[in-house]
Amino acid sequence: MPANDPQKPHTPMMQQYLRIKAEYPNTLLLYRMGDFYELFYDDAQRASELLDIALTSRGRSAGEPIPMAGIPYHALDSYLARLVRQGESVAICEQIGNPAASKGPVERQVVRIITPGTVTEEALLEARRDNLLAALQKEGDVFGFAVLDLCSGRFNILEVASESAATSELARIRPAELLVSEDLALILVDSKTEAVVRPLPPWYFDRESAQRQLCRQFGTQDLAGFGCEEMKTAIAAAGCLLHYVQDTQRTQFPHIHALQVERQETSIILDPSTRRNLELEESLSGDSGRNTLIAVLDHTATAMGSRLLRRYLHRPLRDQTLLKQRQQALATLLEGGLSDVLQTLLRGIGDIERILSRVALRSARPRDLVQFRQALGLLPKIQESLLQLNRDSLLLQSLQEDLGPFPNLHELLQRAICENPPVLIRDGGVIALGFDSELDELRHLSGNAGQFLVKLEQRERERTKIPTLKVGYNKVHGYYLEITRAQAHQAPPDYIRRQTLKGAERYITPELKGFEDQVLSARERALAREKALYEELLEQFMEPLPALRACANALAELDVLHNLAERAKTLEYVAPLLSDQPGIFIERGRHPVVEQTLEDPFVPNDLTLHEARRMLIITGPNMGGKSTYMRQTALIVLLAHIGSFVPARRAVIGPIDRIFTRIGAADDLAGGRSTFMVEMTETANILHNATEHSLVLLDEVGRGTSTFDGLSLAWAVVSHLANKVRSLTLFATHYFELTTLPECLPGVVNLHLTATEHKEHIVFLHAVKEGPASQSYGLQVAALAGVPQEIIAQARQQLMELENNTWQKSINGGGPQLDLLAPPADHPAVQILQDLDPDELTPRQALEKLYELKQLLDLAVTH
């Protein structure tokens, strides 16, 4: 920004710009000037880099050149989308004064601030992902979350009691923008959140102010009706969030009318590592489009259904009553034959959830209302389709009741909006002919201008005897009568010269001037009238807005249920039995994603876990299918807890509170953590937080360090989980020493993935069998990976020597392989003490034994 030089003052326009910019120092200020939004100084330089637009200059002000960049006003949305995707906040500064009446710069003011978490425009949003604004506050050990989807009006709060739980919630919510107090922002520096973190002064999180602000928004005396009176930390976060959106959006929010309380104990907790390893929305290779669970499951007909399905996946429920209602709904839809009619009807609904939010914010465009009109017209047909199903599903009945219809609003939109309106209301031609008599009259006046001008031209030609006379119009001079310079002497006395050209003269007459004033006034008045009618039309949505939102929610849920039913039929999924007894039983289970990517048939496998069989030690070759088997178990459990059918012949799923996975690892270079450090951090999280109701998947624990260290750690982790935590655990390993654990640890069982060797080539059978694997097939897998044959031959020779040497040392007493399960050898002093009978020793004998023990201790120290 320029320094103010009192000797060289800024121009009035730049003074206005700098005054407004000073109020928004951390945003890009788009300053409206005619048909462009201009950026100056540092903003111009940054916008030029981010948008790849030309950086120019606009003269000088206060003696300094003014860097400038600009974007056309009609292309604003496309540029905003690029800026928001890069995490920028943008202040839109519009001309609100009348240029004709302004002596100095036209009056301007910021009408809205667009931030990553407050976007509502369709062009700026990903259709199938929620765009969330979150606020996080910490008081003592309690973390309070508030989460707002401004595009739908959903406003949720949640409290958790640990940093690990807060991290898990942050991974689930995945906000586009996160508001935190300035002191808490320091804690989040090392977090892996992709959100734009917005540090705010502590007073934004003042509890009393938050309480007042929330009650004012909801029109209530207190917050008791929302069940959150005691959630002080979350309320502080919610107040901050509401203050922020009011400050940036500068409008009312009638679609935000309630707080919904979420409780972590009602859902299965998935930590960030688990969400990543299960590849719910993004594969481990970073591809978000393919080879993910959502890619297999999401065949929804609407964008709002797709967003709801993602919320299901990221927050699997523990409430068996609700899950069984969803299962019953799927069964009812399947029994009804899954007609394509319902799918087609849903596809015609569009994204009315987000359209309603734009209506509430008064930013809905004409084509939004056309789409909403179409959706309202389809509601009776959707209801009819549901009525044809049997009445066993209470959930489908409830959804059907929420679908309206809304005949009065539908009829109003049919009368009010033309068939194919322009994009913007300011372009005119949105309100249908016949809806408003005053508008029709103004349109008639301006619309018949052509006929009047044709008649005027013909009449003036006859009057002046000038056959080449013509009537024209331009934006600068308005309407005119034009004759050639050679015929100018024939112009009647009432012709008033308006413009002189090289070969022609242009004139105005009192009659033409009167017509011009009337027509231009009619056009302006018609646009103003149309805008007023449009605002009145949006107002008609306000009273039924809660019911319309319930309708949109019901359509989204119906879309998800219909989609899951179709997936179950197409992919041959079955309804899992949800049990109150701990354990998991899966017959012929399949990995939902892997089976869709294979050319060969997927090999299904069984799994049994129960009170007496709580841990499976899984061995077998690399690429044998251990990780697939483990992941498919977790995914089947997760699908069961969103109410979906599952890829298996039969499944019985007991209570689960958390799913943990530690599968694979990579260096965290940015965080300065090695592969082994990442592995141990994830393992520590499991050991601290797993319970007897948790499903734990551990793959190759200890492989990132030396053999003995890794084996020792793996053995200790298995023992702790089996003896202390008693979680349902799948533990894959190449440490064959661990296969002896079932002999001494109750509830631990060996499984292995089968493979066979044919002419020094390995064949993976991918079948799970009881018992430990017989060998690891490491060299065969290396050959399969393309390791040169001479390297494989040398490795095979080295392996034979190592095995022979180990065997020879063992039989010669040269040191057997470390046996972690053998009890530690007793110190000689222990044996002496065990043989003593203190009651039979004389004082002298006792003193001699004491010296003997001291001697043994000294000997041990010197060695």
UniProtKB/Swiss-Prot annotation:
GO BP of this protein: mismatch repair
SMART domains, alphabetized: MUTSac (SM00534), MUTSd (SM00533)
Gene3D superfamilies xrefs: 1.10.1420.10, 6.10.140.430, DNA repair protein MutS, domain I (3.40.1170.10), MutS, connector domain (3.30.420.110), P-loop containing nucleotide triphosphate hydrolases (3.40.50.300)
One Gene Ontology cellular component annotation held by this UniProt entry: cytosol
GO molecular function per UniProt: ATP binding; ATP-dependent DNA damage sensor activity; damaged DNA binding; mismatched DNA binding
Entry keyword set: ATP-binding, DNA damage, DNA repair, DNA-binding, Nucleotide-binding
CDD domains (alphabetical): ABC_MutS1
Binding-site residues for ATP, renumbered to this chain: 620-627
Its biological purpose: This protein is involved in the repair of mismatches in DNA. It is possible that it carries out the mismatch recognition step. This protein has a weak ATPase activity.
Similarity comment: family membership: Belongs to the DNA mismatch repair MutS family.
Protein name: DNA mismatch repair protein MutS
Gene that specifies this protein: mutS
